[in-house]
Every structure is written in C-alpha cells, then in structure tokens.
Amino acid sequence: MKHNGRLKVKFDFSFFAVVAFMIFIDTSGAAVLSLIACILHEGGHLLAMAVCGVNPERITFYGGGIALSKSGMESLTDAKRLVILSAGCSVNLLVAAACFAMQGNDTAAVFGAVNLIICIFNALPIGYFDGAEVLELLLTGFVSLRTAEKVKKIIGTALALIIMAGVIVYCVMCGESVSLSLFFVVLFLIQAQLVS
C-alpha cells in the first residue's frame, strides 16, 4: 500500500488509562514532565526524518509510551538511518543538559532528570528501543541481518536479566521494597524484550 505522505495520529485507550493513573498517583508532577519528554523524544525522530526526506506513516500514543512508524527508512543510507534512530535520545540529552545548566531551578532539574532517564532507557539495546535498532544497524555492517537479529536478541535478553537482577539485589541488600514505578519499569523491560 502506497503511503500518501500524511501523518496519522492514533490514541490507544491504554494511553489515556496510564496517563490518568500516573497523574492520579503522582503528586510531584513528574508524570506530566515525562509525557512532555516523550513527545520531545519522538519530535527529535520526526525532525530527523524530515531532514532525511522520510515521511512517517503513523504516530501511536499507547500505554507503554509513544511509537513512531519508521517505514521508508529501508532505502536510506546507514548514516541517515543512524541519525534518525539517534535523534530522539539526542534531543532528550540536549534538553537534560540545558535543564541542568539552570542552577537553582527545581522544576528544570526534575525535567532534566526525566529527559536523561528517557534518553538512557531508550538507548538500551533491548527489544524495540532505539538502542536495539542502532545495535542491529551497526551489526549488519559486519554480519548478516539474521545473525545481527540473533545477537541483538541475546544482548537484549542478557541486559534485561542483568537489570532485573540488579533491582532485586538492590532491594534485598538495602532492605527496600520495590516501588510501583520500579515494578512497572521492570515489567516494561520484560514486555519490550518479549515483543521484539
């Protein structure tokens, strides 16, 4: 099916459910800042796609975040694909740096931390995150696509297990209970790796 160049925006019910839940339990305002940081992240991808001449088909807001279709990238050079895949994390990193430069502004510090966390999280080579796509792209320069996909899956699974084990060890060693947000992060890592 030929793409007509118009961006379709889809809102899944799960997006509204998660946003409502997060706003209900969040008294700090970090949930709203996280949503803004996610929009900035996807905006980075959209800007890079426009610069590289790619028209995205669809952006979907769902319970796990925001997903942007990156179809049409197959015909691009590896360098352009790398720019597009890295653009979201780059925007979050730049916003974090700008926020941390604003000394004495607590909201800016929280927004900077949220952007840094989203940058790091998306850079992980796990599942369908940007880091996994970058890893696969880099690996295909040395091995076949099939081998690159297998290596990506192994690295993603190992890293997800290490992160989950680290959370468990931290909680046991420090006598801490797992917070609801940490539980959802671990659950999201598992889901991302299983879906990919």
Language-model segments: which ranges?
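Hydrophobic transmembrane alpha-helices and their immediate loop junctions
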Residues: 1-196
